[in-house]
Amino acid sequence: MLYDIIKSLRKILLLTLIYVFFASFAFSEEIEKDNIFLIDDAPFDVHKSKIEEIQKSKTEYDSYGFRLKESITSTLPSDEECINHKRPVYLLDTATTRYFEKGPLDSFHTGFFYKGSLPISMIQGGVTHTDYTQNNIENHFRGYLKNGKTSFNISTRYTPRKDLDFFQFLIGDLFVSHQLTQHNRIVFGNSRTHTGEEGSKPDWQVPLISYSQISRNFGNIRKFGARVVGEYDLVEYDFGGYSSDSYFREFFPRVEFTGWVNFKPLGKTNGKYGDLKIGGGISSGHNNFTYNVAGAYARYQYKKFRADFEFANADGYNGNLGLSKKHARGLYTTVYYRITPKVELLARYDFFQPDLDVSKKDIKEYVVGLNYYLKGQGLRFMLNYIFRQSDFGNDSHRIILGTQIML
């Protein structure tokens, strides 16, 4: 009897193995075609509008596993996506983005930003020294709602500052943006004020390793408030009311107003004569004392050539380096030439008078730079040479090697 039971079990086991063997052939090709993630892990909920796009762009894999080259190619953005240097390029965005089929959230993007430099400083009549600088280490989080009009941005920063504690400097962007009309949106939260044209740009968009002197003194600052941002063919504007505090040091000490308008006279010519932008604005507020910053900006771009100019005058200011009662003034002008789609050569003259109430002494910086955009702003290598003439000390030379990575 025991022999008959064992014989029956052997038949059942044999039939099971035969079924599994043939079933694997029957379904393997169908699973391989439909599996948009190309791995056996349970997939996330993906928004339906994205599934077809992912399926069409996916790379086919054989039964022996991943092909490393094809896997990397399918993950990284294409060169066409990296041409526009005004937009961020997160190299791993396709891998770090989650899409949602249910709920109000359409997609959630997680990014990483790093910008570091290695400066070699040579002071005339002094010593030469080299030090490594971590300009930025940040996490970026972006979410988009299904209504197609609302999004939110959060950024956290991990490079310490001596004048701030860790948590004061930790939060960068913390705002919600809503598209009111086709050309206008409202922004509420902690965001960059439009104090100057370059001073309103994020660090990854600045063409050189460092901001200009007026931008790093008067601008490059976030404050908590509400903004209305508009963009048309012939004009763009940014008006905002904010708390005059920065870095969460005080709760609403007083109010600051910042407004900036750019006119684009060639906006209706489709680039036939190039792109011309002329504008200006003010930033005025009170925090223990009243401060006012006024500026003007001009830029012209034609094919591979671009040039810009910015001037600012401050009777007190509240920028990245803190509050100051000083009367300061400065300007910069930059010339750019795009040698190839990935290589850019630029030169800048930067002039700054830090305290006109005391003297008209100034600091001049002559900068030559080379940018190599291997993957747009997502992977950029920079080389800057700076000759600095200062009425406050010895002149100096600096050679700076920089790297920018967005993942």
Walk through the language-model features, giving the residues of each.
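Bacterial N-terminal signal peptides
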Residues: 15-24
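Outer-membrane beta-barrel "beta-signal"
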Residues: 259-261, 368-374, 379, 395-407
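Outer membrane beta-barrel transmembrane domains
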Residues: 336-382
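Detector for outer-membrane/organellar transmembrane beta-barrel domains
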Residues: 103-107, 144-150, 260-355
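Transmembrane beta-barrel architecture of outer-membrane proteins
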Residues: 158, 170-172, 243, 255-257, ...
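N-terminal periplasmic/intermembrane-space "pro-region" immediately following the signal or transit peptide
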Residues: 26-114, 118-122, 407
